[in-house]
């Protein structure tokens, strides 16, 4: 995929360019004061030109080319005012031109990888996830309703504690069984398993809130 100029690191930027979307462009400047400097912290909507000089680690992360990492850098990103789960496909998906067809072909390869690797609930957690998230009925009309249901379930049944020790072997299972409170890592991990339970590919990532 890399040889065909496709990467999940700037996938939305490619799609946006082909769709001629009119999202707001913003320049973001980063001053890394405490995070690991060997990685670059960018959003999903970063433009290709801003990440092409970094080391793209498949669909995992972006690594700095600098020997001791990068402290200060900037990039351009495009933000939509709508939640990502509400995004709808562009009309050209049904009748693509040559460039759009090339994108669709490479995206299909990556999509197959995603569904093969990010759609299965971790072994041993299937019944626990089903018990927690299926106890309340909801109208499943797609990804938006599922996202809201997961938020509602976590808010209703789980307790937050930023000081939770996440080092024990069965910490996620204990959290899902409501034996312990959870921090941001456990809430995010539970949400990933829940999305997979509802057949939506998801994976755990770490990041920062940009305000």
Where would I find each of the regions flagged by the language model?
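Intrinsically disordered, low-complexity N-terminal segments that are enriched in acidic
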Residues: 1-102
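Sequence-level detector for tyrosine residue identity
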Residues: 10-15, 39-44, 73-75, 103, ...
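Weak global preference for isoleucine
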Residues: 18-21, 28-30, 46, 51, ...
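Short, surface-exposed glycine/acidic/tryptophan-bearing loops
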Residues: 81-130, 143, 147-177
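Active-site neighborhood of thiol-dependent amide/isopeptide-bond enzymes
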Residues: 136-211
